[in-house]
Regions:
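N-terminal amphipathic alpha-helical segments
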Residues: 1-73, 88-95, 106, 113, ...
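Short, well-ordered alpha-helical segments
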Residues: 99-108
């Protein structure tokens, strides 16, 4: 069985970007966690997605080696996740200061009001939940592929040792 040298660099980049984005969203929304059960659940989902991305990052980071089929499947699923990560990045951009900081009480108040009201828009919470769910489904499949690969490798190594 031919072995590939891990997964493509763009896959590692997608995973790293996903970690940064989920951590940014999580940091912002955790401050609102006690305000509403929906936000608390969303924080738990973001945290879970972030942890899944971290585990995947450790698993696929070089010098990890996989056969071509495993490598292709993992790359395909992580690339599908890129769309959801991009959408989450858009949501993160909405809560970060997007306009140049201007001096003055009025500008400061407008920025604070915008940031304070944003998490409570129900549609926004639903969108983020959908994006997180989409990303988790693809990542879960990628992790399952890696688990099957590891199990097969362990089984073949164990069988060779018995003979």
């Amino acid at each position: 069985m031919a072995e590939a040298f891990g997964v493509a660099g763009n896959v590692i980049g997608i995973v790293s970007l996903g970690i940064q984005i989920t951590q940014g969203l999580l940091k912002y929304y955790e401050s609102w966690k006690d305000q509403d059960n929906d936000i608390s659940n969303m924080c738990a989902s973001l945290d879970s997605l972030s942890e899944t991305l971290k585990i995947l990052s450790k698993t696929i980071h070089p010098p990890a080696r996989f056969d071509d089929t495993t490598k292709d499947s993992v790359e395909k699923n992580v690339n599908r996740t890129d769309g959801a990560v991009g959408k989450l990045k858009g949501e993160l951009g909405k809560i970060q200061d997007t306009e140049p900081i201007q001096s003055g009480v009025r500008s400061t108040m407008r920025r604070h009001v915008r940031r304070a009201l944003y998490p409570f828009i129900e549609e926004t919470l639903s969108k983020i939940k959908r994006f997180v769910s989409e990303a988790r489904q693809n990542l879960d499949f990628a992790l399952q592929v890696l688990q099957v690969f590891a199990s097969q490798r362990f089984a073949s190594t164990g069988t060779q040792g018995l003979g």
